[in-house]
Amino acid sequence: MYKRATLAAAILIFCGFILSLGAASVAKIRGYDLSNAWAFAWQVVAPKVVFTQVTSNVIASQVYWMGDIQDQELNESSGLASSNLSDDVLWSFNDSGDSARIFALSTAGVALGQWQINIPDPTDWEAMDSFTIDDQAYLLIADVGDNLQWRPFVSVVIVAEPEVDSDTGKILEPIWQKKFRYPNGPRDCEAVAVDTNRGEILFLSKRNLPNELYKIPLEKIKTVDDTMLIAEKVTDIHSIPRLSRGEEDRFGNATPYMGMPTGMSIRANYLLVTTLQDAYLLNRNDLSQPASTIRLPYIGQREAITFTRHADNSAYVSRERANSDEVADIFRVDFLLP
């Protein structure tokens, strides 16, 4: 947190100087939104706790520790997806700073291999999902992280899901890849899901309150031209609370971030969203309904969630390592559907 605050202070000074020049033309440099960067830096340097009063049903659940992520090169499991080709296999990748590679691991954390995708190194991979179309299994990886909320565009790439037993080490070629932006300015996002029933990709903003849900039709992603897409806003999500009063003492400096969505998965009529604090189950057919809360243990930087391959009431969650020698866990949570 100290390093983040120091960086934010430097950004604050730089962006404040540029914006103080008062010219609209310098509000952006190479397409990056300095106004949003300044606002983010100010939030980090002087964070404010946001309290929301949201009525949420707590549903019965049981959490099981599955194992440790054994591959030490997977130190920031920022996205998670259940395989559609193999039982008990998960896919993941590192947060920003790594090459364009994905990792396969068992649901107990055993390393099963790495695959490089033939694209330039990503800016900030933050989310992934697995899905099938016409019996072909795919993986979507979303380069949508934007802490400063200033990127001129973000992107997704889709590859055919490799066979863990036979394709180990194979270079994966992108099937589709697309750049896009949001209609109302840059958004930070770590929660993405593919809704094959409706034929769309969903993106849930992280920092906005209320959180905002956007979509892009899959058919537009599958076009081969270089057209920049514009995501369409679906709705505001009011049912994910940031905090309850009295929790500042429990979480300390992490308090302002505890209720921000860091992962999302979809199954049938449910959207499953995790935050650093708890998970929330939303009715995909009526997003105005209150979310159901699934209590999760506080395990540090929980970054990803995915439904298990065969169950609508079970999911895996993973967390990042804070340090290279720290254990990164995988948990399974089973819950009663409302």
Where is each model-derived feature located?
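Hydrophobic membrane-insertion alpha-helices, especially the h-region
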Residues: 10-22
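Positively charged n-region of N-terminal signal peptides that target proteins for export
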Residues: 1-4, 80
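Alpha-helical transmembrane segments of integral membrane proteins
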Residues: 3, 7-11
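Aromatic (phenylalanine/tyrosine) cluster motif
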Residues: 2, 14-17, 32
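Sequence/structural signature of beta-propeller domains
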Residues: 20-338
